[in-house]
Amino acid sequence: MSDNLNVKNIASDLSISKKSFLDNFFKKQFIKNMNNLEKGYMTISIDGKEYFIGDKKSSLSCNFNVIHNSFFTLIGSGGLNGAAEAYALGLWECDDIVALIRILIQNQNVMNKFDSGIASLAKPINKSIHRRRKNTLSGSKKNILAHYDLSNEFYQLWLDDTMTYSCGIFENKNSTMKEASIKKLDSLINKLDVKPGDTILEIGTGWGSFACHAAKEYGCKVVTTTISDSQYDYAKKKISLENLEGQVTLLKEDYRNLTGSYDKIVSIEMIEAVGHENIPTYFKKVSDLLTNGGKFALQGITYNDQKFDTYKHSVDFINKYIFPGACLISLSQVLDTLKKDTNLILNDLLDITSHYAKTLNIWRENFLGKRDEISSLGFDDNFIRLWEFYLVYCEAGFIEQNIGDYQFLFTKKEGLLP
């Protein structure tokens, strides 16, 4: 079990069996902050008393119940990270957590208040932890293992049969998750204009869905690399079971160490694990690996340009507990990097943000439906609740377009760099 899931807050040593001075102090602050809510509508239950806040006419509403007053100390001392920790500990509940997070996103002033004051004292601690998780060659390996090597069995319980852990594309409202995953793979393959006999380099194997699908359905060859031990083992077996050893070459190599020359490269939601400081290195490596006129298809999760500079230096609960070392990209960051560090041209951009909200909703339903099986793998209730919050948090972010997901197509043109 990863030590990233040891829910720890500067208030964690306080007793949760009785009310404390801090609980009451932070409760007053919480109520005061929430009274600034302008968009959305909430009913908040505390100690049997109900507070009605926000816009009663809003179609976006939820009922929030504080189960134990230790919640107030956690959010007061840890901000929104503390709220996530409190949910993992079972200190609050809500009938619609997606609506709750959407309301908070729409009321940025309220979110900012929770992360200021005493809660800001936790920021240097979190940043210190985050700095120790830099995506060096050894650090990237450790960070990837912390997320993807929880166990293949864990992910098999709630991903679709393709074992694709990235946004699908739903052709219609009746499309299944598996169909959406395959549609996404086909979309990227079509962008690359793959023909039988072509060789594609894939940066980030996952569990092998792209490599095997491309080889089997399009008759091409794929060289694919991962630094996850569990994913490598799973993909190796998948390649063997599907008799694709002659078409798919599986590597366990960091992208920075890749060599060779390729006409076509693909990378699906791996760039989030690179770290913002390594984005120029990543794109330069891709540019160097591509032949002149070669194509690069990328699927990546983005953060709003306007808030990106603040975001990339912050540490949210996903960095702290779910995916150490992770950082989303921004569209302007990508374009700036292309201009300064590569011979790549952006040819096409497909916004699939709305599809990610549905993808996450399906994953969450599957995940919660397998709660008992997940527990039997050795994951405790804190872990399950924290991951539930992670899936909900992301779903709300995509609905509100606080974060996005795009498929990019780039072409290499020699001589662009001075």
Kindly give the residue locations of the regions a language model identified:
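Conserved SAM-binding loop of SAM-dependent methyltransferases across substrates and taxa
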Residues: W207-Y218
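A short glycine-rich, Lys/Arg-flanked "PGG" loop and its adjoining helix->strand segment in the class I
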Residues: P280-N292
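Feature captures hydrophobic
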Residues: M1-S181, S187
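Conserved beta-strand signature within the Rossmann-like core of class I S-adenosyl-L-methionine
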Residues: G293-I301
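Substrate-binding/catalytic lobe of Class I Rossmann-like enzymes that use SAM or dcSAM, i.e.
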Residues: T302-P418
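Conserved SAM-binding loop
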Residues: A235-K236
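A short acidic, Gly/Pro-enriched loop at the edge of an enzyme's catalytic core
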Residues: R256-I265
